[in-house]
Amino acid sequence: MAKKSIIHRDKKRENLVKKYQEIRNSIKENIKQAKSLNEKWELQKQLQALPRNSSPTRIHRRCFVTGRPRAVYRDFGLSRHVIREMAHSCLLPGVTKSSW
């Protein structure tokens, strides 16, 4: 299980991304539409002035149950360990053990 502080840090980042999403998108759109290089530089400075954690690339996908950052399946939002345990316990509908 991941430390609670790390899970809390990721939740905080998600909230910052939601808070600054519209501002960030509007600045990026203005950068694309800017014609002069000086105007682009000024807009880029505005973008850099936003908090670092407000960028969506800073968010890390984590397992909902354990908080594990690696081997997380997007379809379930769970790590491979939890998926295996839940599949063996018949808690995931439609998931069957493969055999060939």
Curated annotation (Swiss-Prot):
UniProt-listed InterPro entries: Ribosomal_uS14, Ribosomal_uS14_bac/plastid, Ribosomal_uS14_CS
This protein's name: Small ribosomal subunit protein uS14c
Gene that encodes it: rps14
Family annotation (Gene3D superfamilies): 1.10.287.1480
Keyword set, alphabetical order: Chloroplast, Plastid, Ribonucleoprotein, Ribosomal protein, RNA-binding, rRNA-binding
Assigned protein family: Belongs to the universal ribosomal protein uS14 family.
Subunit structure: Part of the 30S ribosomal subunit.
PROSITE patterns recorded: RIBOSOMAL_S14
Residue pairs linked by disulfide bridges in the UniProt entry: none
Compartments (UniProt record): Plastid, Chloroplast
Cellular component, GO annotation: chloroplast; small ribosomal subunit
GO molecular function: rRNA binding; structural constituent of ribosome
Function (record text): Binds 16S rRNA, required for the assembly of 30S particles.
Main location: plastid
GO terms under biological process: translation
